Regions:
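Short, basic/aromatic recognition patches that contact phosphate-bearing ligands
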Residues: 5, 10
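Short helix-boundary/capping micro-motifs
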Residues: 11-27, 53
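Alpha-helical residues within the helix-turn-helix
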Residues: 24-25, 42, 63
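Residues in the recognition helix of alpha-helical DNA-binding motifs
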Residues: 36
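A short LG(V/I)-centered, amphipathic sequence patch enriched
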Residues: 41-58
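Coiled-coil helix of the DHp
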Residues: 62, 66-70
Length: 70
């Protein structure tokens, strides 16, 4: 079972399109949020995010998870 907190973190990143901005919004550190997302991806066995220099983009699996988690 996926923790609700992890889904909230994921949705914030999807909304902000930035791990840094999502971390600020969620009042957690950027490294903590990044690690949580890597753990979520590992648990699901799917890449959810494409991490660019300026922007985070959802993969197809990430977009699917977003649609189900909202």
């Amino acid at each position: 079972m996926i923790e609700t907190r992890l889904l909230q973190y994921f949705l914030a990143i999807a909304e902000e399109q930035s791990i840094t901005r999502a971390a600020e919004y969620l009042h957690v550190t950027q490294p903590t949020l990044s690690k949580q997302m890597m753990d979520l991806e590992r648990v699901l066995g799917k890449q959810l995010l494409i991490r660019g220099k300026k922007k985070v983009t959802l993969t197809e699996d990430g977009a699917y998870l977003r649609s189900k988690a909202q």
